[in-house]
Amino acid sequence: IAYHRTPGRLPGVVFMGGFASDMTGTKAAALESFVRQRSNAFVRFDYQGHGQSSGHFRDGTIGQWSRDAVHVLDALTEGPQVLVGSSMGGWIMLLAALARPAHAAGMLGIAAAPDFTEDMLWAGFDAATRERIERDGVYEMPSDYGAPLPITRDLIHEGRSHLLMRGTIPLTCPVRLIQGMQDDEVPWDWALKLTERLQSEDVETVLIKHGDHRLSDGPDLDRLRYQLDRLLGHVEGVAT
């Protein structure tokens, strides 16, 4: 697993990226720079089959990528962490926090997409596409961001064992969710459903009326920095 770690004080921050993205993205870089100015520790990494990490993207599953995140928490961090998850990373963040609750002092979800393999991909495919996936094992899905993305039968089937939005999510740490209302990949009301599903009483959800899925332009990055700063301050206040 390729990673970049900036040493610093606690709580640390661990950034978990999206489906087929990598740790060099705009949000990861902007938040790393901000957290460094704040003197907190920061880790960003690539899941297997992503970016600079080994493996093939089409071999990946939600279980594999969540294990990658847990491994990063175990090997590269100590003490309380604020987990930041973008898109699919929001699902990975929740799974990692459930696996290592002592590490998860807070969470910041950016267009968080828990259960997206089932409720966004599979639910959005027509019968012919579903048949192709079941028969051929893969569907090359067109992407707005570059080459088609291989959506595999394993990704869909294995993802079903990690679905979180069917019941209460037993996490009690503070959570901040940021969601654009012009997001064409994650419906904005998904953030409200996640707010309801989380057991935590300390959940704040920010809807950005003109925000898209990426939330990577200047004003959006300012909002992310502001929310992360508030959350880190809150966690630091609780810890002292």
Regions from the language model: what does each represent?
Residues 182-186, 213-214:
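Acidic catalytic loop of the alpha/beta-hydrolase fold
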Residues 32-54:
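Conserved alpha/beta-hydrolase
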Residues 103-150:
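Hydrolase active-site cap/lid region
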Residues 59-75:
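Alpha/beta-hydrolase active-site loop
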Residues 170-171, 177-179, 183:
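Short beta-strand/loop motif that positions the catalytic acidic residue
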Residues 211-223:
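Catalytic histidine-centered segment of alpha/beta-hydrolase-like enzymes
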Residues 28, 173, 187-196, 220:
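Short alpha-helix in the alpha/beta-hydrolase fold that links the catalytic acid
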Residues 19-32, 189:
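The serine-hydrolase catalytic nucleophile loop
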